[in-house]
């Protein structure tokens, strides 16, 4: 397979250079927090997929439990982590009412810092791995889906592997692997907001104090 051709990661230390907002007059605030990560060819891809599963797969996911189950404050939330031949973005996104925007941002900061400081416990990483395996199975239901996945992998210079080998690779991933990657990629994240200007600027002030 081809060697990974990743571009350098942006580790700009100035918070203002990692913040952007779009002013609009709607009743919603949309928040996105994350950074570019690795390509599909990287050995870091699967650990980040496990993290994605932990955060966003199903009603037992960390994002759902924190924002909807415990606080009931979001319209939409999830993780955007597309497959890319180059460095892929890994973004947590959520939309909330303007009244709940500051509270939602504080919750997101708390979750983000927890990912940087505390490894997933055994039960959390086990459940995330099983969800990830299940998602790969769902993506291979038809011959067309299987062929499309294999063609995509080959186009990236990756040799397709069997389901058994893929599951073995997932099983080998540890909480330590994941927390190393969260600190590598997410200690200096980027923040993008769309919403009321005064709310965006207040979030910006809190952002500068934390990142």
Map each language-model feature to its residues.
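Active/ligand-binding-proximal structured segments within catalytic/core domains
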Residues: 33, 43-55, 64-69
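M16 family metallopeptidases and their MPP-like homologs
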Residues: 32-38, 68-117, 122-171, 188-196
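Short beta-strand/turn micro-motifs at beta-sheet edges
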Residues: 18-23, 76-82, 180
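Histidine-acidic residue clusters that define the catalytic metal-binding segment
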Residues: 6-10, 136, 152-184, 206, ...
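An aromatic/glycine/proline-enriched structural segment found at the starts
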Residues: 1-39, 197-211
């Amino acid at each position: 397979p081809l060697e990974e051709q990743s571009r350098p990661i942006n580790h700009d230390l100035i918070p203002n250079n990692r913040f952007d907002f779009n002013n609009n007059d709607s009743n919603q605030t949309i928040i996105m927090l994350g950074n570019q990560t690795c390509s599909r060819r990287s050995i870091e891809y699967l650990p980040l997929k496990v993290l994605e599963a932990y955060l966003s797969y199903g009603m037992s996911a960390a994002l759902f439990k924190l924002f909807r189950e415990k606080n009931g404050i979001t319209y939409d939330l999830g993780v955007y982590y597309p497959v890319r031949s180059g460095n892929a973005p890994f973004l947590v996104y959520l939309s909330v009412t303007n009244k709940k925007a500051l509270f939602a941002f504080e919750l997101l900061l708390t979750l983000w810092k927890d990912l940087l400081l505390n490894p997933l416990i055994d039960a959390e990483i086990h459940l995330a791995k099983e969800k990830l395996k299940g998602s790969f199975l769902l993506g291979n239901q038809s011959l067309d889906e299987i062929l499309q996945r294999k063609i995509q992998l080959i186009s990236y210079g990756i040799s397709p592997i069997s389901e058994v080998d893929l599951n073995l690779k997932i099983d080998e991933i540890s909480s330590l692997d994941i927390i190393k990657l969260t600190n590598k990629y997410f200690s200096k994240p980027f923040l993008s907001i769309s919403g009321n200007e005064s709310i965006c600027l207040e979030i910006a002030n809190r952002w500068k104090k934390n990142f």
